[in-house]
């Protein structure tokens, strides 16, 4: 890597983009400092000196949000950053996906990409700056990488597409799209949308790709200027004679028939047995520990299985479970299967099954998101769990990993556009999707199960959502798009393209690929095929439950809304929160107060809500001119008496208004503690209340 500082500048969506090399982190294989507006990200790429054993490419992408970047001190006892939050994890996955396919096949060195956000301007996306930084760090390093790539955000406002919309623009945008790719094709898409059409989504993707091409050209100019020397990487060549011998044995022992097994577990068992039989042919009795040969045979067998699966799909249009390319697995769904929960939905598609369970809470049960931007109160959450038993395996039980966080967030993104506004449904909603069985497309099963749970719970959603995962097998001169992919097709195919939406349009998409990129033709066809599949699944779901229930569960909390004048909020809260805590302690309710004076009262028992409402009404009650009250004498002065109309509100009863008869002293007719009926005659501009008993005598 060059040790001399170099600075390169361009413009990106109306803001300055600067890439600096040669000054920071010089012991990394590659490092760049990206400045986008006031956002600053340090991106580094480091590779191990020796390759790792195994069949996978050990790439790790990290994205770290430093709280000082936004002028904040971390919360908690230690006052320092802990493990990455969900948003940071999702960004790391977002960067990983377009980069991973562009390393040479067979490259097994550990590669670690680190992105540190040093300064954060919410209007200049740190996430997209980190994606460009990751691409540049790899491109200027000696690590073999077939980039560069770039990524952009795309918004859609009033029929117009916008590159890298600001925070304010995102609030009104119908689309929140992240798209990445290289000069020739798109290789990553992720989006949340408010029911936009397939054509609108397609146009958005390739509108973004036009900007990506310009950014890739800019990066290539930097690479050409720096001229990094890349590591020499020579892939390991297979022994062709050995490959032919193994291939002959697979044909002899019926690889095609073994692959074409409907049941996943039976297929896996049959493949394991076939591999074991073939490997036994190569075990030398005099050298039973010939591990290198055995390892090579297993690697060849795995490649031959992959080739056979792809050949069957591409040439014979037959999938491992016997389906046609556009055929969906058998569907089954139920609702209301858990009696004490607030809502539940069980969705099964072939050998993939998700149980989604919904819980309603008060608005105060929101999740507080404290990241680099302003604090956010999230009142809809979707969490995804993938236990080992879902794939018939054992293993340690750990906290949710990157995959679980990513799938949960995708489901949340797909559903959040149909969640009713607070004014219409004043609840916090949490859905947990438990994957009970998995053979591919479990994230989309969780979306379908969650829609069923929402309707079972009586949440007045705007429209039901269904999800489906599309696959792809490419040949040199042809391709086959698959509807509703299973696990083997995901692992051995070229694409996992998830699409969720209503009958009217798309609410979320996510695309991962293992090839260099996708053409417009493939993406357009995949979107249309996904639409047809989504509608088929939707029709099945609506046969189970066609609209939200009209009543909530008996075990769900009840929430009542009332409104007070904003200047009365302080009276309800009291000094140091004393009054509101007294209400909560006495009634057991949950209270949430908005700045406009809206109060949400939540509890399981309606009587508790009624009591809390009575207390608040008493606190915020106001005197009205012309109304009569049974008042209590609280203080006596020479000129009259101060009487309490109700808690928190006193009035002056002037000596001349006590009686129609002349009174020399107030004490002659009133003493502290007496009750007297009064009528309100005046409330002045300062809110002072004047009362009269005399008016009632006349």
Curated annotation (Swiss-Prot):
The keyword Metal-binding appears for this protein: yes
MF (Gene Ontology): 3'-5'-RNA exonuclease activity; magnesium ion binding; polyribonucleotide nucleotidyltransferase activity; RNA binding
EC number(s) reported in the record: 2.7.7.8
Keyword field contains Ribosomal protein: no
GO BP of this protein: mRNA catabolic process; RNA processing
Signal peptide as annotated in the record: none
Keywords for the protein's UniProt record, in alphabetical order: Cytoplasm, Magnesium, Metal-binding, Nucleotidyltransferase, RNA-binding, Transferase
Gene3D superfamilies per record: GHMP Kinase, N-terminal domain, K Homology domain, type 1, Nucleic acid-binding proteins
A GO CC term attached to the entry: cytosol
Residue ranges of domain S1 motif in the record: 626-694
Subcellular location, record wording: Cytoplasm
Annotated function: Involved in mRNA degradation. Catalyzes the phosphorolysis of single-stranded polyribonucleotides processively in the 3'- to 5'-direction.
Protein name per the record: Polyribonucleotide nucleotidyltransferase
Source organism of this protein record: Staphylococcus aureus (strain MSSA476)
């Amino acid at each position: 890597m060059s040790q001399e500082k170099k600075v390169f500048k361009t413009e990106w969506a109306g803001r300055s983009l600067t890439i600096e090399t040669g000054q920071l982190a010089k012991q990394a294989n590659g490092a760049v400092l990206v400045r986008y507006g006031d956002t600053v990200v340090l991106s580094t790429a480091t590779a191990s000196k020796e390759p790792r054993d195994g069949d996978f490419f050990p790439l790790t992408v990290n994205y770290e949000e430093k709280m000082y970047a936004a002028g904040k001190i971390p919360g908690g006892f230690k006052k320092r950053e802990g493990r990455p939050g969900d948003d940071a994890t999702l960004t790391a996955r977002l960067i990983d996906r377009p980069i991973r396919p562009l390393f040479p096949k067979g490259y097994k060195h550990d590669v670690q990409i680190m992105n540190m956000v040093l300064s954060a301007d919410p209007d200049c996306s740190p996430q997209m700056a980190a994606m460009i930084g990751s691409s540049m760090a790899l491109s200027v390093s000696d690590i073999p990488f077939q980039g560069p790539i770039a990524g952009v955000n795309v918004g859609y406002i009033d029929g117009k597409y916008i590159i890298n919309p600001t925070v304010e623009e995102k609030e009104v945008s119908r689309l929140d799209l992240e798209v990445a790719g290289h000069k020739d094709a798109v290789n990553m898409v992720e989006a949340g949308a408010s029911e936009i059409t397939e054509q609108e989504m397609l146009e958005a993707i390739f509108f973004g790709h036009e900007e990506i091409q310009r950014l890739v050209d800019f990066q290539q100019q930097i690479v050409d200027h720096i001229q990094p020397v890349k590591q020499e990487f020579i892939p390991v060549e297979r022994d062709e004679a050995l490959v032919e011998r193994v291939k002959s044995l697979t044909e002899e022992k019926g690889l095609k028939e073994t692959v074409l097994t409907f049941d996943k577990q039976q297929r896996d068992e049959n493949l394991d047995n076939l591999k074991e039989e073939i490997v036994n042919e190569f075990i030398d009795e005099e050298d039973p520990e010939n591990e290198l040969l055995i390892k090579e045979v297993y690697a060849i067998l795995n490649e031959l299985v992959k080739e056979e699966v792809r050949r069957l799909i591409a040439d014979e249009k037959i999938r491992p479970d016997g389906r046609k390319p556009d055929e969906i697995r058998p569907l089954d769904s139920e609702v209301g299967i858990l009696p004490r929960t607030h809502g539940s939905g069980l969705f099964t598609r072939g050998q993939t099954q998700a149980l989604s369970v919904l819980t309603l809470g008060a608005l105060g049960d929101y999740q507080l998101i404290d990241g680099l931007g302003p604090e956010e109160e999230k009142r809809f959450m979707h969490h995804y769990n993938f236990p080992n038993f879902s794939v018939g395996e054992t293993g340690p039980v750990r906290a949710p990993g990157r995959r679980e966080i990513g799938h949960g967030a995708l489901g949340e993104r797909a559903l959040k556009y149909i969640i009713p506004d607070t004014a219409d449904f004043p609840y916090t909603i949490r859905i947990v999707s438990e994957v009970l069985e998995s053979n591919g497309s479990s994230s989309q099963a969780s979306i379908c199960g969650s829609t069923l749970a929402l309707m079972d719970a009586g949440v007045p959603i705007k429209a039901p959502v269904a999800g489906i995962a599309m696959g792809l097998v490419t040949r040199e001169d042809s391709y086959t798009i698959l509807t509703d992919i299973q696990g083997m097709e995901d692992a051995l195919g070229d694409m996992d393209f998830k699409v969720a939406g209503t009958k009217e349009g798309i609410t979320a998409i996510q695309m991962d690929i293992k090839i260099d990129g996708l053409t417009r033709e493939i993406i357009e066809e995949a979107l249309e095929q996904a639409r047809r599949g989504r509608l088929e699944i939707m029709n099945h779901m609506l046969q189970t439950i066609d609209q939200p229930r009209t009543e909530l569960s008996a075990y769900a909390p009840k929430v009542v809304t009332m409104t007070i004048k904003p200047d009365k909020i302080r009276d309800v809260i009291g000094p140091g929160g004393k009054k509101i805590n007294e209400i909560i302690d006495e009634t057991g309710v949950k209270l949430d107060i908005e700045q406009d004076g809206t109060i949400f009262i939540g509890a399981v028992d309606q009587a508790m809500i009624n009591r809390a409402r009575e207390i608040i009404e008493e606190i915020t009650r106001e005197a009205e001119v012309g109304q009569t009250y049974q008042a209590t004498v609280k203080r006596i002065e020479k000129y009259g008496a101060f009487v309490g109309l109700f808690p928190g509100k006193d009035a002056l009863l002037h000596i001349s208004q006590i009686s129609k008869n002349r009174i020399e002293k107030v004490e002659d007719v009133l003493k502290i503690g007496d009750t007297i009926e009064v009528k309100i005659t005046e409330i002045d501009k300062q809110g002072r209340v004047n009362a009269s008993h005399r008016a009632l005598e006349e």
